[in-house]
């Protein structure tokens, strides 16, 4: 059984799995591993680590900015694999890489899956990979023990949802809106009906929902018909604000991020950042 499967199996009654997204190299390369450990301590059931890319089509402005900043620091795909290796020294929490197919194809599909697995990656999420064109990646991922997650959206047909469920391993990622990450949930009043409908067609995998979740209440409301939720832009925004505030110490920044993760999972109050001691 994979680490991700074990995580889902270990959830308590009515407990929702929480996945948290961070971009590798953001806000700077030295901060990524400590941030990963902070959200791990805060209760992340699994982590998505973004592979920086110059044209992240599905991402809203926060994650676009994070990716651009990471690239400005010179972060490469091999660097991201080294980040995973460093994280793995102290954690067994499932970690999936999220990004786009071009860098993976450039690296070499089998070589990438091999090196990712050796680094300690548990799975891949590639939003621009159509399931009908995924044979090579499906085969390579399976050969190296990696999960391969596919996405659905409110405009995904029933037949395509079935295909996604057949192709996916790990879970199916239901984006809550047809748009960019970080979009406002209030702009999609039919999201509840969409997730109830998707639940009827996703039979082989857990169903998780993401895009637009900013608070614990958002997460609980949106995940009523799913097995869990994923938060990205809200976490990126908080990290960005903390690292741009010169009054915050590194310890306080990490403690605040850990507290935000705990809030998303269990509803504890969001911690108030403390300034550097005078």
Curated annotation (Swiss-Prot):
Entry keyword set: Amino-acid biosynthesis, Aromatic amino acid biosynthesis, Lyase, Tryptophan biosynthesis
Assembly and oligomerization: Tetramer of two alpha and two beta chains.
Reaction it catalyzes: (1S,2R)-1-C-(indol-3-yl)glycerol 3-phosphate + L-serine = D-glyceraldehyde 3-phosphate + L-tryptophan + H2O
Enzyme Commission number, as recorded: 4.2.1.20
Name under which the protein is recorded: Tryptophan synthase alpha chain
Pfam families hit by this protein: Trp_syntA
Function text: The alpha subunit is responsible for the aldol cleavage of indoleglycerol phosphate to indole and glyceraldehyde 3-phosphate.
Organism: Salinibacter ruber (strain DSM 13855 / M31)
Pathway: Amino-acid biosynthesis; L-tryptophan biosynthesis; L-tryptophan from chorismate: step 5/5
Any one GO molecular-function label of the UniProt entry: tryptophan synthase activity
Residues at the active site: 48, 59
Annotated family: Belongs to the TrpA family.
PANTHER family given in the database record: TRYPTOPHAN SYNTHASE ALPHA CHAIN, CHLOROPLASTIC (PTHR43406:SF1), TRYPTOPHAN SYNTHASE, ALPHA CHAIN (PTHR43406)
A GO cellular component annotation in the UniProt record: cytosol
InterPro entries: Aldolase_TIM, RibuloseP-bd_barrel, Trp_synthase_alpha_AS, Trp_synthase_suA
């Amino acid at each position: 059984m994979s680490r991700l499967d074990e995580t889902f199996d270990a959830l308590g009654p009515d407990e929702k799995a929480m996945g948290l997204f961070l971009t590798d190299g953001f806000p700077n390369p030295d901060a990524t591993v400590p941030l990963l450990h902070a959200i791990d301590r805060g209760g992340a059931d699994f982590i998505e680590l973004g592979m920086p890319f110059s044209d992240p089509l599905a991402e809203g402005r926060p994650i676009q900015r994070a990716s651009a900043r990471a690239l400005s620091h010179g972060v490469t795909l091999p660097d991201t694999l080294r980040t995973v290796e460093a994280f793995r020294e102290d954690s067994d929490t499932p970690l999936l890489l999220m990004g786009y197919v071009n860098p993976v194809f450039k690296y070499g599909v089998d070589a990438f899956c091999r090196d990712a697995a050796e680094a300690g990656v548990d799975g891949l999420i590639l939003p621009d990979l159509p399931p009908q064109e995924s044979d090579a990646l499906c085969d390579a991922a399976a050969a190296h023990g990696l999960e391969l997650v596919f996405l659905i959206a409110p405009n995904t047909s029933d037949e395509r949802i079935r295909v996604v469920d057949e192709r996916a391993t790990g879970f199916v990622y239901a984006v809550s809106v047809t748009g960019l990450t970080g979009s406002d949930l209030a702009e999609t009043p039919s999201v509840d009906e969409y997730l109830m409908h998707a639940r009827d067609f996703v039979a082989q995998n857990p169903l998780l929902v993401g895009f637009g979740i900013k608070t614990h209440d958002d997460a609980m409301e949106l995940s009523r018909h799913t097995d869990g939720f994923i938060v990205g832009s809200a976490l990126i925004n908080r990290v960005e604000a903390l690292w741009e505030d010169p009054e915050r110490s590194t310890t306080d920044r990490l403690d605040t991020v850990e507290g935000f993760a705990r809030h998303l999972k269990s509803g504890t109050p969001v911690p108030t950042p403390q300034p550097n001691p005078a």
